[in-house]
C-alpha cells in the first residue's frame, strides 16, 4: 500500500496547478557553448529536472553530445561513445569482458561506481535491464547496444545524483538517449572498417526516414533501421598475445596450462612433468623459472591464444518507430516501438577437465550440492600401463574449441498523450519493455557419464585423440542453453507549469506519479541441474516486484539572478519497503557571463532483483576449515553458494555538487564542478574464511561427521564508500575569414578519492589512482580540435587516461603507464546531398599499457579499460534528402 508521503507529494503540486501559466515547448537542445552562442533560447526540459526553463546554465552539470558530435566522433555504437567520456572513470564493464557474463553487451558506470549505479533512459523513461547480470549476480544494467544510435538526436549525461527526480539507480548520474523529434526527410548510409593489424572487419548500414510536420500537417512519423556486424578478434591475431608467453614482462608468465603435479600422462605414458622435451602434444616446452615439487627443468604447456577471444563478434539489427499525432490544438498522441536483435560470440580457453590434484565438480541432482568428479583413469583402460587407477590431467581440445554465443532480443513499446492547458502542461504514458537472452555454449564441455563410460571401455583414445571415433566424441561433447528474460511494465502521469508570481519571477513546478512492474528470470541449463556437466557455471535468478512513486519539484526565483530548486520523491517497493529522496539546489548569476551552482541530495539504490530474490550462483575453490573432524585447519573444497537475501535494505547515498560556469563570449564556455558521493549500506558478500570460522549453521553446512559440505555467502548490507572529484569542461570557437571555423573542446575528470574498506568493519582505504580491487585512474580527459569550412569538416580527438599505482606491487611493477589515443576524422560534402567520411582510430597504434596484475588472464592489460584493436580504419557515406 502506498504510504501517505506519496499521496502528499502527488497532490502538493497538482493542487497549485490552478495558478499555473502555459509553458512553451521546444525539443531542441545543444551543448553549453552552442546554447550560450544562441540569440534566443526556447524552454526545454533538461535531464535532471522535469521543469521547462530557458536558462543556459542549470542547477546540475549535464554533458550534452549533439547529433553533429555523434556523427563526427566516428563511433559506430552508443557504448563506444559513452565509454570515452571523462566521467566514465572506470570500474565498469564492456563487451570485451565476455568470459564472465555476456558477449555483445555493454553498460556504463559513472564516477567509478558500477553500472547498477547509473540510470539509463530512453526519451526520459526507463527500459528493461539486460537479462544476465554482470559481476556474478549483482550488477544489473541496461544494454546500451540494444538502444538506437542513428535515431538519436542527442545524448545527455547528468553527472549528479538524481534520485529525487528518477528514483533508484540514479546515484552516480543519468544517461538519457533522446531521439529525433519532428524530423522530415530521408537519410541513409553505410560504412566499412578494419584493423591495421587485421581482424575486426566491421560493416554498418542505416536508414532514417521522417514524414509530416507536426505544426502544419498535424502529425510526424520517424522510422530508423540500422545494421552492424563485426568479426571476432582472437588472441592469436595479435603479436602481443599470439604466443601466450608474457615472461619478458614484469610479473608475466604464459597464458596456458601445464601439468601441476609430479607426473603427466602423455601419449598413454606417464612422463615427468619436467624434462619433457619431445613429449608434449602441442610441442610447446617451457623452462620452469623456479623448482616445482623440488624438481627443475622443462615443462609441457598449452597455448590458449587460438582458443581465446579478445573482442567478440557482433551482429546487431535494430528498428525504431516514433510517431506523433495532433488530436486537438491542445492535445497530441505519441508512441514508439523499438526492437533490437544482438548476437555476440566468443571463444574462451578451456581449462583441464582433469587435473592431477582433482578439484573438478558436478552438481548432484538430488542434493543440489557440488560433488567431486574422479580424475582417475580406470585400471582396465588400455592407455593406463600401471594396472591401477591412476590420476590424469587432460584437456578436451579434441571436442572442439569452446564457443559461447549470446542472442538478445530487446523491445520497448510506448503509447501516450500530452496536452497544454492555459495554466499547465501534462503528459501520460504506458509502456512495456523486455529483454530475452539465450546463452549457448558448445564444444570443450563433456557429458559426465558418457565420458566416464568412454574412459572405462577405452573408446576415448588418449594415445591419439584424432583416432577417437566421431560418434564417441559426439556423445561426450555437451552443448548447453541458458535462458533469461527481463521485463519492465509501467505507467506514469506528470504535470508542469508555473504556480504564481514572485517579485523575481514565476515559480515553476513539476509533479507526477509512476507505477512499474519489474521481473528478472535467469535459469540454469537443464544439463547442469541434472548433474551432467563437469565444473558447471551456475547463476540463476527469479525475482519480481512492483514500484509506486510520486514526486514534486519547484523552481523558486528569489532574486532576478538567484534561483532555488527543491525536489523530493517517495518510492514504495513491494519487496523492501519505502525510500524518500529530497534534493535542494541553488543557482546564482552575479554577472551575465558568470553563474554559480550548488546542490545537495539524498538518494538510494534499491537492491537489484538478483540481490534480494531467489538467486543462486555456485563457485569453486577452497577454504581453511578450523573444525574439520579429520584434520583441523586443513584446506577443504566445499560448494560455495552466493545467494540472494530478502532482508536487504537499499543502499543510501548523499550527493553534493558545487560548480561555476563562465561564458564570457558567445564562443567561449568553461565549467568547473566538484562532486562528492557518500554511500552507506553498500551491498556485497562476506569473506568466506570468516563465514567458515563463524560456523553459523545457517551459512555453513556439514555432514553427520562434521565434514564441510557447503558455504552460503548471502548478500548483505556491509560497508560504506566515499568518492569525490571534479570535472572541467571547456569549449572555445574561433571564426576566421577564409579559413573556416576552429573549435577546441575538452572534458576532464579528476578522481580525488575513492574510499572503501577491504572488508566490513575495516578502515577506509583510498582506491583512487590505483588498481587496488578495481582500476580507477585519477585523470581522464577527452580533447578535440575541430575545423570546418564550406564542404570540409575534420577533427582530431585525444583520449587520455592517466597511469595508476599497482597495489600491491606485482613482479617489480609499482605503476602502470598512462595511455594516449588519437583519432582523426575527415568529411567532405561536395556532392549534392552526399557526405563522404573517413576515420582513423588510434592513429599512432598505441598499445594498452602493461598491467602485471593481469599476468595470464587472456592478455596482460586491463581489458575493462582498453582493448587490442590497434589502429583502425573506417570509411563511409551518408546521403540526405
Question: What do the PLM-derived regions correspond to, one by one?
Answer:
Residues 446, 752, 800-806, 827-881:
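C-terminal beta-signal and adjacent terminal beta-strands/loops
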Residues 192-196, 203, 211, 227-231, ...:
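Transmembrane beta-strands of outer-membrane beta-barrel pores
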Residues 742-829, 844:
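C-terminal beta-barrel architecture of Gram-negative outer-membrane proteins
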Residues 35-36, 45-101, 109, 122, ...:
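N-terminal plug
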Residues 1-84, 111, 206-211, 329, ...:
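N-terminal Sec signal peptide and the immediately downstream disordered periplasmic leader
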Residues 147, 182-185, 198, 214-219, ...:
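Short loop/turn motifs that connect adjacent beta-strands in outer-membrane beta-barrel proteins
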Residues 135, 231, 237-248, 276-314, ...:
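Surface-exposed, low-complexity loop segments enriched in small/polar and acidic residues
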Residues 137-138, 149-153, 164-175, 181-241, ...:
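Outer-membrane beta-barrel translocator/receptor signature
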